[in-house]
């Protein structure tokens, strides 16, 4: 929402896309959170106003974010798929009206354990697949908007590799040295 404060946990391709979405929606502050500080330059290029690495702080990351904002963020987005990070994203939200959105998919058969008071105070916790859009209707609109240059994807493409180097592309992704690779045939 316009003028809001957002925190994005995870700076892979999806997290960086969330940053672009927050910027397009008019967020006034976008805090990027990742344990790989090498990703911060790209996050700032795409709209993050602040970048923090949880490893650089003694306090839990939700307390760091509350300290940075004075009250917690309006919106948080967890795009990693880690249970602990999902709870931290919720706890980083403003206690009366903050909204936390889980985008990252955890490994199968994991349960979330959290303090229910995180919700009783007024926070909202929701999940989202495909950005909450209905693919039948939304994909054509998304493609049309891209073709009209309403948003750019080129900054997310970090490598172009021949198909014969597909394994190298996965290695780059796992090492955190790639956002998205395009394979050529």
From Swiss-Prot:
Enzyme class, broadest EC rank: oxidoreductase
GO cellular component: cytosol
InterPro entries named in the record: ADH-like_C, GroES-like_sf, NAD(P)-bd_dom_sf
Cofactor binding: number and manner: Binds 2 Zn(2+) ions per subunit.
Keyword Oxidoreductase part of the UniProt annotation: yes
Biological process according to GO: retinoic acid metabolic process; retinol metabolic process
Enzyme Commission number(s) of this protein: 1.1.1.1
A single GO molecular function term of this UniProt record: zinc ion binding
Keyword list, A-Z: Cytoplasm, Metal-binding, NAD, Oxidoreductase, Zinc
Catalytic activity: a primary alcohol + NAD(+) = an aldehyde + NADH + H(+); a secondary alcohol + NAD(+) = a ketone + NADH + H(+)
Cofactor(s), by name: Zn(2+)
Keyword Metal-binding appears in the UniProt entry: yes
Name of the protein described by the UniProt record: Alcohol dehydrogenase 1
Organism encoding this protein: Anas platyrhynchos (Mallard)
Organismal lineage: Eukaryota, Metazoa, Chordata, Craniata, Vertebrata
